[in-house]
Amino acid sequence: MGQSSLDHGVQGPVAGTGDFGPLKEATATGFISCAQAPRRARKRVEGTASSNVFSMFDQSQIQEFKEAFTIMDQNRDGFIDKEDLRDTFAALGRINVKNEELEAMVKEAPGPINFTVFLTMFGEKLKGTDPEETILHAFKVFDTEGKGFVKADFIKEKLMTQADRFSEEEVKQMFAAFPPDVCGNLDYRNLCYVITHGEEKD
């Protein structure tokens, strides 16, 4: 599998249009996909000794990462830089991200962040990642105020329209096991714990 076959043909929201609706939807897909990818790929990542990052993931996972990369590459130059990150956070509703935060993110990479570097960074992070931490991090993206919960209706919409789509029945089963509170909030910390440990916290 060559890199060139992965660098073309992925469509994303048009940069510079000011229409953040599609970008929000697509970015959410990327984060949800990232939460799912460790579940499916972690054993392969931990067990591989290959230096070829593309061997860590199957084709569908690479495509998901490519879609996330394309969304974040706001200026479509093939690299993710500080301004791309700032625009992505703005699309998610975080408009006051500090320069220092953005610089720290960019500095995690060994050089300019093209798709291969982006994929390598995910591969490295997945090697020692705690699945509970990974899932929590994905939920925290939507919990911008750090309250520990997200709106159940929002999660339902994402589960049924993005990535590996849930059916109505699957969503009902999930909410039967993890019912939202009277305000319609879902305690995602407890949900993540049960997913990864198989039982509720005491």
From Swiss-Prot:
Pfam families: EF-hand_1. SUPFAM superfamilies: EF-hand. InterPro entries: EF-hand-dom_pair, EF_Hand_1_Ca_BS, EF_hand_dom, Myosin_RLC. GO terms for cellular component: mitochondrion. Induction: Up-regulated by interleukin-7. Keywords: Calcium, Metal-binding, Repeat. Ca(2+) binds at residues 73, 75, 77, 84. Residues 60-95, 130-165, 166-201 form the EF-hand domain. One of its GO terms (molecular function) is calcium ion binding. Specifically expressed in precursor B- and T-lymphocytes. The keyword Electron transport does not apply. Residues 1-21 are annotated as: Disordered. Disulfide bonds: none annotated. Myosin is a hexamer of 2 heavy chains and 4 light chains. This chain binds calcium. This is Myosin regulatory light chain 10. It comes from Mus musculus (Mouse). The gene is Myl10.
